[in-house]
Amino acid sequence: MTAIWAEENKLAIWLRIEVLACEGRHKILGEIPAKDLIVIRRRAGFSMARCRQIEKRTNHDVIAFLENVAERVGKTPARHIHQGLTSSDLLDTTLAVQMRQSAEILVRDIE
């Protein structure tokens, strides 16, 4: 249960949401070129240490995370990440995922 609410899991969920949003914008809306999506899928990642370092400057955890992901993905593909989303979209969805992960543990323990 502790791992679900750990900072690293939260950011891993953020990353999954961002990549899934890009995949949807490519597949459904045709807004992201295939070559950029391939780069995003291959290179998207984050470093906890780097996110903390950026957050000291920005005072915003989501912006720090997005800057770190952009560093890894590269300028052109990075312009697609988080486009059309808000910080609340990311935070609220992540909270729902963490609650679901926690509920699965609780239900399993009850059974």
Protein language model regions, located:
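A helix-coil-helix interface module used to build multimeric assemblies
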Residues: M1-E111
